[in-house]
Design a protein with these regions (language model features):
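Acidic interaction surfaces
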Residues: 1-116
Length: 116
């Protein structure tokens, strides 16, 4: 059993990925947003067990930063936490892959092996 304060956990996660509260563009999910100050007011008053069991914090909750990076809630085997996702940018150089159909491969680079 590990009781944590959600506000402290969130601030720690933000600092761990070299961001600040004022870097936040929005908090919510793909359909809803919450006021940033209101979010932290509620988070600071929320203590929960982040260990094994059912998820206490919504798993679709995201903090999106102005540069496109994000923190997203993640749950694995009953343990829940923030997971960092860097912003997506187009690579400056890349290799092309051939494709004639999608198969049951896991990665794009493997598609070259299945071109018939």
């Amino acid at each position: 059993m590990s009781i944590v304060n959600f506000g402290k956990e969130t601030r720690f996660a933000i600092a761990t990925v070299d961001h600040f509260i004022n870097d936040i563009a929005w908090i919510g999910n793909y359909n809803f947003q919450v006021d940033i100050d209101e979010f932290f007011k509620v988070a600071d008053n929320t203590n929960y067990d982040n260990g094994y069991g059912t998820a206490y914090i919504p798993v679709d909750l995201m903090i999106v930063f102005k540069n496109g990076d994000s923190l997203r809630r993640f749950e694995y085997d009953g343990s829940e936490y923030w997971k960092f996702y860097p912003s997506l940018t187009k690579p400056t150089s890349f290799r092309h892959f051939k494709i004639d159909k999608f198969t049951d491969v896991k990665y794009c680079e493997k598609l070259n092996e299945y071109v018939r």
